């Protein structure tokens, strides 16, 4: 029997934390969550970047991951992203990074967001299982974007690949079980929308590439 979904608001909805005001701003969305059964662990999903969806107006992606989590008997969903910059399309985020890079600044630092890594760690502390769902778009198409790595300016596509590996390694170091809904032909974890939300055990029955590394 399904537990009735509990909808919380404002900073309580986002779980508080040291900097609750940074979980949701006009420019960034660091974390969005729904908890409906506090007796079960929630599922952490890490996508590419957030849309303009809010706690009051969920988008199709968030509705889909909620359905998948409920059908896999999790107690809730915490949605985070590699990049916290809010945009309806990933190109919005990449164009913002390009504009910053044109001024000889770190375009990646801008779209990742100053509090994103801290929020990923804080969210991971609440879960056992993490699903990566950032697709190919997170690691491709970063032309004319520059990032700073070890005090060296590097190209966009190189930085993007190194950064997603860093986040994966971070979740491993925190002892999390790593999954994906499926992988793309390029080997990246697929976005949740192509998948049937009614399929039971969709997450836990998939032997993931991340588990084998």
Task: Please tell me what each predicted stretch does.
Residues 42-44, 76, 129-131:
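Structural motif
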Residues 57-64, 163-166:
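Conserved alpha-helical elements of sugar-nucleotide-dependent glycosyltransferases
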Residues 52, 86, 138:
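Feature marks short, surface-exposed loop/turn motifs that line or immediately flank catalytic pockets
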Residues 1-59, 71:
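Active-site and ligand/interface coordination hotspots across diverse enzymes
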Residues 31-37, 60-77, 120-126:
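Short amphipathic alpha-helices and their capping/turn segments at secondary-structure boundaries
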Residues 75-94:
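Short connector loops at secondary-structure junctions
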Residues 93-213:
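Glycine/proline-rich loop-helix segments at beta-alpha junctions forming the active-site rim
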Residues 47-48, 82, 134-136:
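Short, well-ordered beta-to-alpha junction loops that form the rim of enzyme active sites
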């Amino acid at each position: 029997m399904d537990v009735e979904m509990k909808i919380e608001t404002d900073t309580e909805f986002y779980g508080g934390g040291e900097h609750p005001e940074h979980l949701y701003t006009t420019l960034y969305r660091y974390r969005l969550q729904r908890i409906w059964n506090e007796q079960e662990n929630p599922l952490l999903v890490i996508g590419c970047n957030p849309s303009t969806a809010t706690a009051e107006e969920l988008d199709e992606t968030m509705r889909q991951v909620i359905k998948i989590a409920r059908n896999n008997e999790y107690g809730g969903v915490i949605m985070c992203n590699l990049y916290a910059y809010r945009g309806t399309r990933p190109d919005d985020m990449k164009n913002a990074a390009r504009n910053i890079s044109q001024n000889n600044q770190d375009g990646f630092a801008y779209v990742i967001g100053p509090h994103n890594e801290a929020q990923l760690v804080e969210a991971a502390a609440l879960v056992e299982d993490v699903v990566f769902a950032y697709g190919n778009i997170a690691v491709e198409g970063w032309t004319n974007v520059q990032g700073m790595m070890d005090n060296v300016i590097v190209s966009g596509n190189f930085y993007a690949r190194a950064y997603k590996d860093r986040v994966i390694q971070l979740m491993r170091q925190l002892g999390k079980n790593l999954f994906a809904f499926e992988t793309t032909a390029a080997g990246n974890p697929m976005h949740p929308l192509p998948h049937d939300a009614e399929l039971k055990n969709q997450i836990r029955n998939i032997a993931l590439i991340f588990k084998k590394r």
